[in-house]
Each structure stands twice: as structure tokens, then as C-alpha cells.
From Swiss-Prot:
Keywords: Amino-acid biosynthesis, Aminotransferase, Histidine biosynthesis, Pyridoxal phosphate, Transferase. This is Histidinol-phosphate aminotransferase. It is an enzyme of class 2 (transferase). The modification N6-(pyridoxal phosphate)lysine is found at residue 214.
Length: 356
């Protein structure tokens, strides 16, 4: 008699799935964490809501209204979720039939688009970006048949550059009546002029992902947003969990999105941008650094001589970066989160000491 294991009972696509390798999963014993694009220091909050015996609102009113005001959209155009990662998954669950429809994304880019689709059993199609990391619009057009959701990260993680807005418009015209286009704006606070939030009225099939994990310094809160037209939001509400945000999370998120919270966020952004420019200038003078790419974000992508050896050397010194070697077109590249001046100096000194 054959013995069926628990793993045998699992769905085939789950058995074959490679989970997303988050910065925390990759681990390390560092004291300079520059691998997850987090804000380097903690922001203090006091809980104002102490009553936890009742279930929270599905979409907490204060959070939704504060975010809508901040983003310049209507409250009906906002959905809050457990990080933008949940938003990625909700869009696939709402719009893609497993075994029939596909998503499309353009590597090198964020890894959760493919993981979310593969978990659900939805086909993934890729159209690598051009050499300048802009969209290959002809390649996308050729692969659009059967695609229901297109993900475009701008500014792009891990490359750090903005997608050309005219290319976004062309993509939105190509997909009109065919697919949802998702602009992942996780890092938009570092270049707010580039947001597509003002385009929602023009493009009913546009959705925008946002997060409190980066500029708002709340990665541990797990709070993200989807901005879209009301018809899209209503569909997402059908597939979201009944209580996605706990009461303490909603409490802190509402405070972070208050007028004072927004002012504090913008001060953090200014500080990070100044530190980014300092670190970029220093990296360009270091012998083991071959190229430093422009960035509109809170991280820097650079190409190194002997990047694997450099990565391990810094790892052994407790400086944890993100290795991007396995991403298409990123051989020799490491991604460095912009941290404090002290952390920048640790990186600079360690790289200057490298003999490669």
C-alpha cells in the first residue's frame, strides 16, 4: 500500500513553489541592516485605542480618510491592507482565473508579483526591461493576450529609476478594456511628483500600490494601500479578509497619516535624500565599485568588481546588503539601503578596505 505524505496532499503548484526570499528570511548576524529598504531608526507612537475586545472595522474610517486626503484621491478610491504585498495578491485573486489568465511583469523588479501569482496558480509572463530599465512596450504588446494584470514598479525595486510616464500612458492605452495596470509606488514618497494618482479619472483600469513601510518608517506595522477607481475597490473588497487591520495597526496608521505625521515623513525623506547623495558620491570614488546607478528612492544599486566576495566580506563584518546577482541584467550588482550617516560611513570604510 502506498503511503501518502502530507506534502503529497498539497497542491502541486505549492509543492513546486520557491518562497519569496525576504530580507528577514535570508537572515544574517549584522548590526548594520541595509538590505530591506527600511527607515534606519524607529518612530515613536502612543496607542490611543486601548479597547481590544471588539473586532476592528474592515476599512478603518480614520485611516482611509487620512490616506485619501494625503494621496489626493476620494475615500472611495482607497483600500487598506496588510502591506502592499496583500494588495498585490488581492488584485490577482479578484481578476485572474487560475489555469486560464496570466499576470505580466518586467524584470529586474520586485519578486512578490510572481510569488503571489504562483501561489494562486496563475501563469506568470515576463518581458524583461530594455537596457536602460525602461519598459519594452513592443514586447509587452506581443504577450498581452490572456493577461489580466500587469505590474510595473516605479520607482523600480531594485534598480531605483522611474518608469517614463509616456511609456506608462502607452501601456495604459494598450491595456484599456483588457487588463488592470498596477503601478507599484512603494517608494513614491522619495519622488512624489512622479505619482500616477492623478491619472485615476482618466484610466479606470489603473491601480496604484502604496505602503507605510518605507518613508513612513513603519515596516513592522504591515500597512499598505491600493488606490483605484471605486469599481476596482468594490471587487477587491469581495476578496479581502474581514478584518485585515488590527486595532493597534489602524491606530498607529491614522496617527502617521495626520498632518503632523505627514510633516514628519517629509522631513525623514529630505534627510534620506541628503544621505543618499552623500553615499552615492563616496561610492563613485571607491576602487571596487564599477558603477553607481541613479536613484529616486531610499536605496542605491551599484555594480562591483567581485561582488560576491565583497558581499560576503561586508556580511562577515556585520554589514548586510542585498545581493542582486541573480536578477536579469544585474550581474555584479548589490543594493544598499540608505541608512544613518554612521551606517553610511561603515559601508564606505569597509568598501575602501576591499582588495579586489
Amino acid at each position: 500500500m502506498s503511503t501518502v505524505t502530507i506534502t503529497d496532499l498539497a497542491r502541486e503548484n505549492v509543492r513546486n513553489l520557491t518562497p519569496y526570499q525576504s530580507a528577514r528570511r535570508l537572515g544574517g548576524n549584522g548590526d548594520v541592516w541595509l538590505n530591506a529598504n527600511e527607515y534606519p531608526t524607529a518612530v515613536e507612537f502612543q496607542l490611543t485605542q486601548q479597547t481590544l475586545n471588539r473586532y476592528p472595522e474592515c476599512q478603518p474610517k480614520a485611516v482611509i480618510e487620512n490616506y485619501a486626503q494625503y494621496a489626493g484621491v476620494k475615500a472611495e478610491q482607497v483600500l487598506v491592507s496588510r502591506g502592499a504585498d496583500e494588495g498585490i495578491e488581492l488584485l490577482i485573486r479578484a481578476f485572474c482565473e487560475p489555469g486560464k489568465d496570466a499576470i505580466l511583469y518586467c524584470p529586474p523588479t520586485y519578486g512578490m508579483y510572481s510569488v503571489s501569482a504562483e501561489t494562486i496558480g496563475v501563469e506568470c509572463r515576463t518581458v524583461p526591461t530594455l537596457k536602460n530599465w525602461q519598459l519594452d512596450l513592443q514586447g509587452i504588446s506581443d504577450k498581452l493576450d490572456g493577461v489580466k494584470v500587469v505590474y510595473v514598479c516605479s520607482p523600480n525595486n531594485p534598480t531605483g529609476q522611474l518608469i517614463n510616464p509616456q511609456d506608462f500612458r502607452t501601456l495604459l492605452e494598450l491595456t484599456r478594456g483588457k487588463a488592470i495596470v498596477v503601478a507599484d509606488e512603494a517608494y513614491i514618497e522619495f519622488c512624489p511628483q512622479a505619482s500616477l494618482a492623478g491619472w485615476l479619472a482618466e484610466y479606470p483600469h489603473l491601480a496604484i500600490l502604496r505602503t507605510l513601510s518605507k518613508a513612513f518608517a513603519l515596516a513592522g506595522l504591515r500597512c499598505g494601500f491600493t488606490l483605484a477607481n471605486e469599481e476596482v475597490i468594490n471587487l477587491l473588497m469581495k476578496v479581502i479578509a474581514p478584518y485585515p487591520l488590527s486595532t493597534p495597526v489602524a491606530d498607529i496608521a491614522a496617527q502617521a497619516l495626520s498632518p503632523q505625521g505627514i510633516v514628519a515623513m517629509r522631513e525623514r525623506v529630505a534627510q534620506i535624500i541628503a544621505e543618499r547623495e552623500y553615499l552615492m558620491a563616496a561610492l563613485k570614488e571607491i576602487p571596487c565599485v564599477e558603477q553607481v546607478f541613479d536613484s529616486e528612492t531610499n536605496y542605491i544599486l551599484a555594480r562591483f568588481k567581485a561582488s560576491s566576495a565583497v558581499f560576503k566580506s561586508l556580511w562577515d563584518q556585520g554589514i548586510i546588503l542585498r545581493d542582486q546577482n541573480k536578477q536579469p541584467s544585474l550581474s555584479g550588482c548589490l543594493r544598499i539601503t540608505v541608512g544613518t550617516r554612521e551606517e553610511s560611513q561603515r559601508v564606505i570604510d569597509a568598501l575602501r578596505a576591499e582588495q579586489v
